[in-house]
Amino acid sequence: QNLEALNMALNRWIAAKGILPERLEQLVMEEFLPMLPMEPVGKKFAIDRKNKVIILVGQ
C-alpha cells in the first residue's frame, strides 16, 4: 500500500516535470506526497531509474 502511494506520487512527478527526482524526499518537499511512509524493517525505498518505479530493497 505504501509502495503504491509512492509510485502514484512518482508518476505525478514524472508527468509534471518529465524527469525522475534525485531523491524521494523531493516528492514531499514539492508536495507530491504529504510524507514519506515508514519503511518495513530491514528494507528501504529506492528509485529504480531504469523502470521509473519505486521499489523496496534490502538495507
Predicted regions and their residues:
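Extracellular/periplasmic head regions of type IV pilus-like filament subunits
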Residues: 1-4, 8-59
